[in-house]
Amino acid sequence: MKIIGIDEAGKGPVIGPMCIGGVRIDEDKSNALKNLGVADSKKLSPKRRVHLAAQIKKYADGWFVYEVSPNQIDELRKLMSMNDIMVLAFGSVIEELPSDKIYADAADVKEERFGKRLFDNYMEKHPDVSPPEVISKHGADDLFPVVSAASILAKVRRDELIEKIKVDMGVDIGSGYPSDPKTKKFLENWYRENSSFPDIVRHSWKTAQKFIQ
């Protein structure tokens, strides 16, 4: 039986993309991921995450990271909620890695509702396939090694993209999270000098809006 784990990195930042990681393996190999030492990516050092990401890709039957740019997020938010965007983004990973069982980190206060939306979204597109089982849980990256692995791939990819932004911009933008003093300082300085934000910024975020208004 094929199983897939899905998790996101970068849902909350004001700078940079959101990355949705997916890892597919045979269910009887899930212990191999656990033995690698995968854990929630937030608890690992960047160096350890990079090392584990390479190992995960070797063990996985398939893997995929779906990226949603700041501009895409801004445009979609004109039409739908962030939860709706998460359903679409997770759905894109499921499309890439179809499986018998789907473990997802719930991106909704009601975890069952998020799982049902993922299921309905998939079955609407594939009415003739055997229905997958969907397990949607808060903290799934702590509960299921396959989701921990997906979390690591998502975080490593976002970290790579943030580092590229720093190089391209020639300035330290920090982590991109609204609470980061370096990020706030970058936004303040950039807007003061340019009266607008570059496309690396999510203009629809309150952190950015307070400068624009």
Swiss-Prot record:
Query: Which cofactors are required for activity?
Result: Mn(2+); Mg(2+)
* Any one Pfam family match given in the protein's UniProt record, by short name: RNase_HII
Q: What is its EC number?
A: 3.1.26.4
Q: Which NCBIfam families match?
A: ribonuclease HII
The GO biological-process annotations, alphabetized, read as: DNA replication, removal of RNA primer; mismatch repair
User: What function is annotated for this protein?
Assistant: Endonuclease that specifically degrades the RNA of RNA-DNA hybrids.
Q: What is this protein called?
A: Ribonuclease HII
Cofactor: how bound: Manganese or magnesium. Binds 1 divalent metal ion per monomer in the absence of substrate. May bind a second metal ion after substrate binding.
- Recorded name of the encoding gene: rnhB
UniProt keyword Oxidoreductase present:
no
Q: What is the organism field in this record?
A: Methanococcoides burtonii (strain DSM 6242 / NBRC 107633 / OCM 468 / ACE-M)
**Positions of a divalent metal cation binding:** 7-8, 105
Catalytic activity entry: Endonucleolytic cleavage to 5'-phosphomonoester
Compartments, as annotated in UniProt: Cytoplasm
The record's Gene Ontology cellular component field reads:
cytoplasm; ribonuclease H2 complex
Q: Where is the RNase H type-2 domain?
A: 1-213
Q: Which PANTHER family match?
A: RIBONUCLEASE, RIBONUCLEASE H2 SUBUNIT A
Q: What domain of life?
A: Archaea
Name the keywords, alphabetized: Cytoplasm, Endonuclease, Hydrolase, Manganese, Metal-binding, Nuclease
Q: Which family does it belong to?
A: Belongs to the RNase HII family.
